[in-house]
Amino acid sequence: MNYQVTVSGDPELAQESVDFVSSGFGNMSMNVNTTSSHHHHHSNSGNAEVSFNGGFGMPNMTMEVKETHSGHHHHHSNGGNAEISINSGFGMPSMTMSVTDSNSGHHHHHHKESASVNLSLGGIVGAVVGAVTGGVMIDGRNRIWVQLNQSSYVGGDIISGTIEMDCIVPFFAKGVIVKVKGFERLWLQELRTETEGEGSNKRTVYKTIDHKENKEFFKSTIVVYPQAGTVNCGHYSFPFSYQLPSDLPGTFCHDGKDAMGAYSAKILYKCKATVDVAHKHDLKSTTKLIINEKCGELVQPSFAENKKSFMLTKGKLHVKTWLNKNAYFPGETLVAKMKANNTSIKPTRKISLVVHHTMQLKTRLYHRCITNAIYKQQYDGFQPCFYGKRYLPFSIPVDLKPSSSLGKHITSSYLLELECDIPMAIDLSVTLPLTLFAPQFLYSTVPSQPPGTPLPPDVSYRHPWEGDEHATACRKCNKGFSLFARKHHCRHCMKIFCDKCTSTKTTITKLAYPKPVRVCEECYPIATQGGNKYQSAKLMAAQYQASLNAYYAQYASLYPQIYPDQQQQQQQPSAPPQQY
C-alpha cells in the first residue's frame, strides 16, 4: 500500500525539523504491523500498530491505528475511515489524525491500494523539534569560553569581553546569552551548650545550630546573539559588555573550623556564557570574576608610631614605622621602614613583623569574630641607645585571602604589627592597616623588577654601643670597675668611662637627645655644638643610588621593552622617589 502524506503548518518549523534530522543526528525507522479481516459482502475492521524508533537517542514513539471499512464482492467501490492516535514518550502532547482511504473491493484477488493522509501540524513540528533537541547531548568536542579584557575589576568598572566558541560538530541552537552575577553566601555552625530538666533530671545537652545568610549584589542576562538556527563548523566570537554596580565588596572565599564550629564564607562573582540549546544540555562555560574593592583614596603611604617608658631604667623607646603603600597583592614584597630612637640602656633582642587576619561573620541571629596571627617574620634587634633607620623586607604569602570590607555578612581585614622584643619589659608594638587585593597571577608576563633589587641601606646616627662585658677599666683614667666603681657610657661616642670622667652633661640635638645626658670630656665640646653623626644618611643615599642605577641598567638590558627611552639614550632610571 502507498501513502501520500501532505503536511500543512508552519514552514519554518518544518524546515527546522528537516535541518535537525539532516545535521547528522540519526535516522528514523518505522515498523508497521497490521491485522485485518474481511469477508464477502460484510463490514470489516482492522488494527495497526506503528512504532517509530529514533536512531539518535530520542525515546520511542508508538501510534495506534483503528480502521473500519466495508468490503464488497466483485470490484465495487469501498470507503473506510481510520482514527490514528500518537503517543510520544518524550514530552510531546498526544495528537490525532484522520485517514481517508478509498480502494476497490476484491474477491480472491489483491490490487494496488492508496491512501491520502492529511496532517495539520501547526506547532507539532516545533514540539517535536524542541523535545528532540532537549534530549540530545552536545558533542564534547564543541567548546565555549569567556575572554575578558582585564584580569580584575573594581565596582563601577565596565566588563568587556567576547564569548569564543569552537564548533566541531554542527548542532541546533536558539541563541547565545551571557549571565553575570555577584553574591554573598555565609554558613555558620554554632555549638551551643544547654541545660535541660530540673533536680535529679538535670542534664547538659550539646546542640549544633546552622545559620545561613545569602545576599545577591546583582544578576543580569545579556543576549549577545538572539537568532536561532543550525551552528555550522567553525570559530565564532560574540562581543559583550556590562557595567558593574559601584561599592562592591572584594572577592573572598574561605572555609574553616574552630572551637565554635565550622563556617563557610564566600563573596563570589561569575560570568557564564551559554549557547541556548534546550533544557540542561546547553553548551556553557563559567568564569569567576576577580573584584577588588574600590580604593581610590585607600592606596597611600601608611604611618604609625608608638613609644614606651621603662619602670627601672631612664629613657624611652620611640618607634616610627612607614609603608610606602598600604595595599598589596599576595606574593608581593613590601618594605617596612622603621626609625627608632632608644634613649634607654635597654636593648631590643629582635624585631618581628606579624600579619593578623580578622573575619567578621554576621547572620541575623548569630555573630562570630575570628582573629588569627597567620604569618610572622623575625629580624635582628638593635643595641641600647640606638638611633637610626632600618628597612625590613616582608614577602606576603601567596595563599592569604583578600581583604573585603563592604560585605553585609562577611568582612575580611588585615593588620601588620611590628613588635620590638625587649628583655625584662613589656614589648613595644606598632600596628599598621594592610589591604590585600585578590591574587592576580596573569596580570603581567614580565616581572616588575629584577629579583634581588637592593634595599635602601640601614642607617645608624649614633656610634655602636660598647658592651659592658669587655670593659674592665675607664678608657681615660684607667680606674678599674667594681661594685662601687660603676660603668658609664658617653652618649656621644658610646664608650665606657668611670663616673668622674662622664660627670658633664649636655643636650646633643643632632643625635636626638633633647635632655642633658652624660658625655666624656673629649666629646663634650662637640656635643655642645649638636654632636656628629656616626653615619651620614646623604652619603649612604648617594651610594645606594649608584648601585640602584647599575642594577636597573642590567634590568633594562634584559627587558628593553620596559625602558625603551633609557635604552636608546643610554640613560639609566633614577631611584624611585622616597614617599616616606
From Swiss-Prot:
Primary localization class, coarse: membrane
GO molecular function: phosphatidylinositol-3-phosphate binding; zinc ion binding
Ribonucleoprotein is among the record's keywords: no
Keywords from the named record: Glycoprotein, Membrane, Metal-binding, Transmembrane, Transmembrane helix, Zinc, Zinc-finger
TM ranges: 118-138
Entry membrane topology: Single-pass membrane protein
UniProt signal peptide: none
Similarity comment: family membership: Belongs to the arrestin family.
This protein's name: Arrestin domain-containing protein A
Natural source organism: Dictyostelium discoideum
Species lineage: Eukaryota, Amoebozoa, Evosea, Eumycetozoa, Dictyostelia
Gene designation: adcA
